[in-house]
Amino acid sequence: MLVKVSVENFKSFDKAAELTMISSNKIRTNANHRLKIKSTQLLKYAVVYGANASGKTNLALFFKFFKDSVCNGIPIEATQMFCKNRQENKERESSFEIQITVGDKFYAYGFSAVLSRRKVTGEWLYELYQNGSAKCLFEREGSKRPVLNDGITLTNTEKNKFETYVDDFEGNETSLFLPEMNRGKKYSTRSKLLFFRDVYDWIQNHISIITPDTPLIDLEYYYDDNSLKLINKLIKTFDTGISQVKIEEITLDELSNALPKSVFDKMMQHVKNRMEEQEEPSFRMTMRSKETFFNIEVEGHSEPKVTTIRLHHNKSFYEFGFDEESDGTRRLFDLMDMLLNKREDVLYVVDELERSLHPKLTERFLQLFMQLHDEQRMQLLFTTHESSIMDQAIFRRDEIWFVERNAENASSIYSLDRFKERYDKVLSKAYLEGRYGAIPVFSTFDFREEE
């Protein structure tokens, strides 16, 4: 589970900013929103408010950047991701860290880099303990050799392999060492280096980021009758008018004609890469955009099977395509995986959860999410403008956060819990009145020409 994130000199975040999922021990409401791991109570939800251009989206982008950097390398566009409110920030270090739990172990992993040059200046991984102490598992400084903690005892075989990996990596200023220790390397269940695999796996497979520009995702739904029954049952609860969701098989040529060539080529390259990763390929993925919804299923080395969805509406004689649905209905399909997913220990990060949704539908979605995952290690962190859900009956005070820009155009993050409001306080009203900040401040404007 996510414990804490911190970021500095990234997008609109100039000075170090921090968001924590550790619960306050003074708040008694919604106790089921907490999960206890060892002696630490972690929150399952974080809702982030702020005016337009306050930096809310940049918080969501932090997770995308962090995951992309670990899994695929620091992206080329990172050269423009330093905080641009000060000239010196271009050559200043940026810092990124997440604290997480894997099983019942707590870790802090992070790195620093000069983004304008995509130059890694530091990297570290610590194991954290309940008494507040920490043990450095490995660290590196710039292009120097990564250093393993002296207290980690390796077998001769492991020691020789690790020294080889370090020798090969020494001098590298553009890559991270954590993914290097997971590139084609296998670990026995008794290995003292398992933390490399465990932390990397959590970042790669347990953070799910939902943004409009994330078209390729892995889903287990829309492929068989049982999952379709669940989807049909679920979609009816949202009063969209849809009475049935069906799948329809199409050819690769039809898929090619429905997509821009660049998008189709990129998708097929992704399929090819996935097939090459496995001796006997078997996977499913969904290709999704504002107007398209396609499922791709691969079994063995045969041609991928492609399906799309068709929709029936109440009292209608005709089927509808995905592109004929409203923005709100299409948005629901973006979020459906969050309700159906039964995997343990998943962090969902969603930018503008309420986009295109009616306020009551947003509230209903959150109620269902909380109800369906009440017993699971599953977290949801999302940004929103929807003040109607700023309600202590829905969220705890320590789950509500604000992002605000200061006079220097830099963003800061702070929690509602610092205001110590009464439990009967109408939070949404106080927020819109400006009590907590993080709302637009308008200047006057006169259409009349000056004389």
Each PLM stretch: what is its role?
Residues D104, G132, K315-F317:
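Residue-level detection of beta-strand-connecting loop/turn positions
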Residues D213-E324, R435, T444-E451:
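Extended helical coiled-coil dimerization/tether regions that scaffold
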Residues A108-M267:
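Electropositive, glycine-dotted interaction segments
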Residues E77-F82, R288-F293, T384-E386:
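Short Pro/Gly-enriched beta-strand edge/turn motifs at strand-loop
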Residues M1, E91-S95, V114-T121, H301-T308, ...:
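A short, compositionally biased
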Residues F96-T101, L125, I309-L311:
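Short beta-strand segments that buttress and anchor functional surface loops
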Residues M1-V70, K305-F447:
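Switch/communication elements of ASCE P-loop NTPase nucleotide-binding domains
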Residues R34-K36, Q41-V47, A51, A60-R118:
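Conserved P-loop NTP-binding catalytic core
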